[in-house]
Amino acid sequence: QTLVTQTITINDITPPTASSPATITVDCIADVPAPDVNVITDEADNCPAAIVVAFVSDVSDGATCPETITRTYSITDACGNISLVTQSIVVDDDVFPTASNLGPLTADCIGDVPAPDINLVTDESDNCPGAITVAFVGDISDGGSCPETITRTYSVTDACGNQILVTQTITVDDNILPTASNPGPLTADCSGSIPVPDVNVVTDEADNCPAPIIVAFVSDVSDGGTCPETVTRTYSVTDACGNQILVTQIITIGDDIDPTASNPAPVSVQCAGDVPAPDISV
């Protein structure tokens, strides 16, 4: 009997196989899930032995909005044959930040409107923990007056450039009356001596807003008396928003000047009975 031998070498050099996991998209870097070997579900090998799946690394492309992270897993069979599969994780925030519109403001004059202030936007927030930038955009007037409405706009922008606009309504409406003093009184001997109305006698008109003030004659009203008669002369003082006051000037008509006449020529008569009767026509 003769024995012969055959050497059979078992040496698996075929790498295992597996599919790359599906791409994941998240809003924020904090939303990137932890590595999980269970996302590899179809690992296989030509030999029926245990296959080990392991996390290898996360590598970012260094970009932002979006940032792409390549996550690598190794697939190792019982003979140490290794395959690598990768999963793309895209970090891209497309969610708008939030902020509230500012409360309305009211001003008497356009000069009282406060300057823009980004610090008035106090509740800005975002789904991702990055810097939020608040900026003044512009003031737009409705072109009205008394009131005029100004819409002030601020932008709120997150780190990925997602932006919203918030507004503040500013109403400019002057409801404060102008001021002026009553002109000094006048005295006249006769009604015909009363001077004509003159708006320039009102000299100290003023208003809280720097716009033209109009003074106008309103009326002369007599008390109906005589010797003296009192006339109340009224002027109106009106600002640019139609706020109006009335000022008055008292004019007293009182004639205190004696009349004049010449003595009649002398008359000579011979007898007392010849003295003529009184005659006012002389």
Model-derived regions, located:
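Proline-threonine-serine-rich low-complexity tracts
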Residues: 1-282
